[in-house]
Every structure is written in C-alpha cells, then in structure tokens.
Regions:
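Bacterial N-terminal signal peptides
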Residues: 10-19
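Active-site-adjacent betaalpha module
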Residues: 2-6, 24-49, 77-86, 98, ...
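Short acidic, Gly/Ser-rich segments with clustered Asp/Glu that frequently serve as metal-coordination loops
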Residues: 58-61
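…and closely analogous acidic/polar surface helices at protein-protein or active-site interfaces
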Residues: 64-83
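Active-site-proximal loop/short-helix segments
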Residues: 55
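Conserved H-loop
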Residues: 95
Length: 228
C-alpha cells in the first residue's frame, strides 16, 4: 500500500509538472501579430517624432503621485537625448483643467511641468483637456505638416493619456511605438472597492496597446534602433 501511495504521488507530481509546463508554453498572440505586423526594427529619419506626455507636478507632488514617475521621467529624458541626436522633433504635452479644479487646475502649481522636464524653446508644447492629446489639440495637423509617420510615445499615465494617444494615433495612420519604462501609472480603487495595483494596470495597458495599436519597447531597446 505504501509503495502504491508513493508511486501515485510521484505520478501526480509528474503530471503537475507536465501540466504546468504545458500551461507556460501556451501563447496568446496579439491581433497585430496574427495580422502579420512585423515588430519595428528601425525608425525612418525625418519622419519620427517623440511625444512626452503630462510629466507634471500633479503626478509627483500633487493628488495623484505615481511611484514610478521619477524612473519614467529619467527614461523620457534619455529619449529626448536620442531624439535630439537624430533631429527628431519633441512634442511636450500638458493636461489642463479649469481654475479651481481638484486636479490640473490651470491656476495651480501642480499643473506645471516637473522641474526636470522643462520644454526647451525649440520644443512645441500642446495643452490638452482630453485624455488623448489628439482629442483636443491640433497635434495631428502639426505632425502631418511635418511629414511625421512614426510616433514614439512616453508619459503619464500609461492606462490613460499614453494609451489614449496610441489608440488615436493608429487609425490616423501613424506607426506607434510606446516606451514602456518611460511611462508609468498609479494604483486605482474603484467605486465598488476593488483595487488594481500600479504594476498590473501598467502591464494591462501595455498589453492592450501591443495587441491592437502599436509596438511596445523599453527605452534601452528604442535608442538602439537604427534611424535611417
């Protein structure tokens, strides 16, 4: 009986390992992959722009602090250096709300850009009132006038304004590349009391983007892409 029990338990362990291996080997390709989309391998010179979205005090010292905000900002600065090296335009985006609003109030301090992310004189600055920068600015008109076909997207928050920009850029015929670690978000507690932590929300947003709207890479991968 003991011998049978040992053999039975051993068989269960082996079955469990095999089942686990099978589960881990299972893949769920993105819609873009199934449609034949090829991951970006280079960026076209003169046709690529960098979007730097909402690196504002609200997300650092305001009512919506993002723990990974400083790291995302540091990586966005690396992307700006990369853009400068290859003469890519850098568009800074700032979200604004009416005076007296709880967040991003135009007459408050937290609506201002973070001290370490100040637009230069040469950088266009767009002020938006919608989640997506394309919804309340003339960004599309500006990009098309400049001959831009590819946009690198960075900013805060991943699930909102970054995903919104990617979602709107794709049907406007832009090739979208989101910088995963130059973006970040915060944990959210819903009205029903359920909470989603920042990492789960960040990863879910990136998965949504990669599924249907564009490529997702880390900053180190992006700055290694040839520009030609």
């Amino acid at each position: 009986m003991q011998r049978f029990t040992r053999r039975f338990l051993s068989a269960c362990v082996v079955s469990g390992v095999l089942a686990s291996a099978g589960a881990s080997a299972e893949t769920h390709p993105t819609i873009r992959a199934m449609s034949g989309a090829v991951p970006v391998s280079q960026l076209p010179a003169g046709k690529t722009a960098l979007l730097v979205i909402d690196f504002q005090n609200e997300y650092f010292t305001g009512k919506m602090p993002i723990p990974d905000g400083p790291a995302a900002l540091a990586n966005a600065r690396k992307l700006i250096e990369f853009a400068d090296e290859h003469k890519m335009p850098v568009y800074h985006v700032r979200h604004i709300a009416p005076a007296g609003s709880p967040v991003f109030a135009i007459d408050g301090e937290t609506v201002k850009f973070h001290p370490d992310m100040q637009p230069r004189a040469k950088d266009p600055v767009l002020q938006k009132t919608t989640v997506s920068v394309f919804g309340s600015t003339d960004l599309d008109k500006r990009l098309k006038a400049a001959g831009i076909e590819n946009v690198i997207v960075s900013g805060l928050m991943t699930h909102a304004c970054v995903a919104g920009a990617a979602r709107d850029a794709a049907p406007l015929s832009y090739n979208v590349l989101v910088a995963a670690d130059a973006s970040a978000t915060r944990a959210i507690t819903r009205v029903n009391g359920e909470s989603t932590d920042k990492d789960a929300l960040h990863q879910a947003a990136l998965a949504e983007i990669e599924d249907t709207f564009g490529d997702v890479m880390n900053t180190a991968e992006i700055i290694k892409l040839p520009v030609r």
